[in-house]
Curated annotation (Swiss-Prot):
Transmembrane segments: none annotated. Its EC number is 4.1.2.57. One of its GO terms (molecular function) is 6-deoxy-6-sulfofructose-1-phosphate aldolase activity. It is an enzyme of class 4 (lyase). Cleaves 6-deoxy-6-sulfo-D-fructose 1-phosphate (SFP) to form dihydroxyacetone phosphate (DHAP) and 3-sulfolactaldehyde (SLA). HAMAP family: SFP_aldolase (MF_01912). Belongs to the aldolase LacD family. GO terms for biological process: 6-sulfoquinovose(1-) catabolic process. This is Sulfofructosephosphate aldolase. The gene is yihT. The active site is at K193.
Length: 292
């Protein structure tokens, strides 16, 4: 059996410059907020995702797709560039309490062998981390996910995202990110996708300290995501996180959110989003070169 390795989803530099287009109901809300005709049809999301994959994947080391809206279509249309690896989201988002993702389980519809035949090299699992929910349940889910990936020769990418506790109103996001890393940072996955400390805001020195603290608890390669980070601050966030030990990014919003709902989507992706992704890739290479 062919077992993929981390090198299969990195750039030649060894760094990760990966594009996410697996947002689901959150993306529908983004279209609505941008003034799109509501209710926003599934086809609007599918078209955007497939176009983004076609236009942006040549600049990414990997692209993350979701089964619900775009994976099948992307495969059928050969949307992903040959030079770009494919990652498939294996998480089932359960809405509730007025938010699009209130709970997450492993998607039972995922067929690891079939996605591998289609060319996927990794699966990704979102793990919601709340201080007052059972840690063992999270660890068990990650273990099951790792087994699903590794028994099929696929890479395992976990994405712990912190949320306020179910009960009570005290929430220290920064401490929660660290606590989640303490719990899941040595859980046997191949890659850890993490929220940027301090939303990438403030003094560089503070960001570096926070990122170094995070690095101390993650015993696998790690990358940052861009949700919650101002897209103008994201390139710096990538630099600082990598200075602290990260190996790149797996991000969507910082690359394409500014073109959501604009006319001439393909043109906007080409002229606005592609240069952003290209520059981020250069930053990753630059930071990796400093490690030699």
């Amino acid at each position: 059996m062919n077992n993929y390795t981390i090198k299969d989803i990195t750039r030649a530099s060894g760094g990760f410059a990966m594009l996410a287009v697996d947002q689901r109901e959150a993306m529908r809300l983004m279209f609505a907020a941008a003034g799109a005709k509501t209710p926003v049809a599934d086809s609007v999301l599918t078209d955007f995702k497939v176009n983004a994959a076609k236009i942006l994947s040549p600049y990414a080391s990997a692209v993350l797709l979701d089964q619900q809206f775009c994976y099948r279509q992307a495969v059928e249309q050969n949307a992903v560039a040959k030079s770009c690896a494919m990652i498939v989201a294996a998480d089932d988002f359960i809405p509730g309490n007025g938010i699009p993702v209130d709970n997450v389980v492993i998607d039972k519809k995922i067929n690891a062998q079939a996605v591998k035949r289609d060319g996927a090299k990794a699966l990704k699992l979102l793990v919601l981390w709340r201080s007052d929910e059972d840690a063992q349940q999270r660890l068990d889910m990650v273990k099951e996910f790792n087994e699903l990936c590794h028994s099929n020769g696929l890479l395992s990418i976990i994405e712990p995202v912190v949320r306020p506790p179910r009960c009570g109103d005290k929430f220290d996001r920064e401490q929660a990110i660290i606590d989640a890393a303490k719990e899941l940072g040595d859980s046997g996955a191949d890659l850890y996708k993490v929220e940027m400390p301090l939303y990438g805001k403030g003094a560089r020195s503070d960001l570096l300290t926070a990122s170094q603290r995070l690095n101390g608890h993650i015993n696998m390669p790690w990358v940052i995501l861009s949700s919650g980070v101002d897209e103008k601050l994201f390139p710096r966030a990538v630099r600082v996180a990598m200075e602290a030990g990260a190996s790149g990014f797996l991000a969507g919003r910082a690359v394409w959110s500014s073109v959501i709902g604009l006319p001439d989507t393909e043109l906007m992706l080409r002229d606005v989003s592609a240069p952003k992704l290209q520059r981020l890739g250069e930053i990753v290479d630059e930071m990796m070169a400093k490690r030699r």
